[in-house]
Amino acid sequence: MHELEVLLSRLKMEHLSYHVESLLEQAAKKELNYREFLCMALQQEWNGRHQRGMESRLKQARLPWVKTLEQFDFTFQPGIDRKVVRELAGLAFVERSENVILLGPPGVGKTHLAIALGVKAVDAGHRVLFMPLDRLIATLMKAKQENRLERQLQQLSYARVLILDEIGYLPMNREEASLFFRLLNRRYEKASIILTSNKGFADWGEMFGDHVLATAILDRLLHHSTTLNIKGESYRLKEKRKAGVLTKNTTPISDDEMVKSGQHQ
């Protein structure tokens, strides 16, 4: 190993060490001066570290898949204010510890937008965690039963952005709703939540099994927040119609009906 590679390794500049020979060749061909070469070399190291950090944060985020805002079909959901989405993509809401609430029926793109904003936050260096509500509640209930609730709440507070998906698909009892409130209260004005729900705010009292508690939950969520109410057709139904599985006159069973009939998985 050459002395230069040894020094770079000692400085823990692994990416630069790996590419240094090719960078030296480029510098010679382009006749770069010392400052230009140094900038190019440091940029190479930064790019490598950024990519490695993003891959690590994406893994820790537990996203079910990676979606971007560039992949979102705004033409299919023209009711969404693109200006608001662009502002959210700037992540000022994260810096201000504000929340984003995405409402709408199943399949309109709520989770896609939530994940895309999460990916933006990961790219910016923030710690993100994605959890469907049922998994969150199960995690909190187990922690409470094992007398480690405070520690679990603290662990969930480490995420700069917490994405809570599928609020409203299944009702909660009062104990579960109370645990949910404790989490919101812990994060209030300290870290951001991105939340998706198929229920309008008027239905949250029934959903949480306690209208007073639902009011307190909404108070914490809405105090500093941006709400997008998405009204439109389901992307999934559109694809099924394109494939000929459904006709335009077909009325598919809704997720709420599936829950009531016991068919929801």
UniProtKB/Swiss-Prot annotation:
It comes from the Bacteria. SMART domains: AAA (SM00382). GO terms for biological process: DNA replication. GO terms for molecular function: ATP binding; ATP hydrolysis activity. The keyword Hydrolase does not apply. ATP binds at residues 104-111. Keywords: ATP-binding, Nucleotide-binding, Plasmid, Transposable element. InterPro entries: AAA+_ATPase, ClpA/B, DNAC/IstB-like, IstB, IstB_ATP-bd, P-loop_NTPase. CDD domains: AAA. One of two proteins expressed only when there is a tandem repeat of the IS21 insertion sequence, it is necessary for the transposition of plasmids with that tandem repeat. Belongs to the IS21/IS1162 putative ATP-binding protein family. This is Insertion sequence IS21 putative ATP-binding protein. It comes from Pseudomonas aeruginosa.
